[in-house]
Amino acid sequence: MISKAFVTTLVATVANAASGVFDYKQNGKDWGHIAGNELCDHGKEQSPIDLTGGTYSNSQEININNLYPDGSTSIAIKDHTVQVTVGSGGFEKVFESGSASDFEALQFHFHAPSENTINGKHMDLEMHIVHKYASTDPAKYGAVLGFMFDMEEGGSGKNNLIEQVSKVFNSGNTSGTTTNGEVWLKGFLDSVDTDRFWSFDGSLTTPPCSEGIKWTVFQQVLPISAEQLAKFTNLWADNANYAGGNGNNREV
């Protein structure tokens, strides 16, 4: 069940890893060699994963509340992804045991191509909304909501949320570029079927690859246009730090 009467205004930046600067030259296969990132190599519940309809189900329940903020937005481009800071709002997740946890949104960001795969196939773009446990201070990462975009599976029409976030590219395409604007999440979430999702325990997909993360990836694949997708992929085209220009996605 989901309540979506909210509008969110956000600050967009590009994320560095929690444990320092990193790159995608080997799609994350070299991260575990750096002190503090050992889980990236030796963890037992690492993400991303391959999602299949028969393996992960909607046996758990989520409830997204209407506490996300609105206001002015500063959007900046830096190193590894477009990241949008939320700062409040969140959702409740009810587990099979009957227990529940409240999660507070921190930020959302993008990977192209997707990190999680569906039946072995990468989607064109994946968005992660990262949350902390609402009861912890300082922040302890606790949950990620994942959304897939693909021109073939979801359609090649323009996506309103992607259009709003990608306004930053109108001001330039280099690290440090900033602009002002608003990003509205209500219309985006209204377009998503939140009754069908995969739910699993995993990790952060960037260093230090912390585990114990409650993942929810919605099964509906959403539309994105070729023009919108290109604005993201152009960030790492011909850049050796992004697997030779092939993307900012971790492979496990």
Enumerate the language-model features and the residues they cover.
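Alpha-carbonic anhydrase
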Residues: 2-252
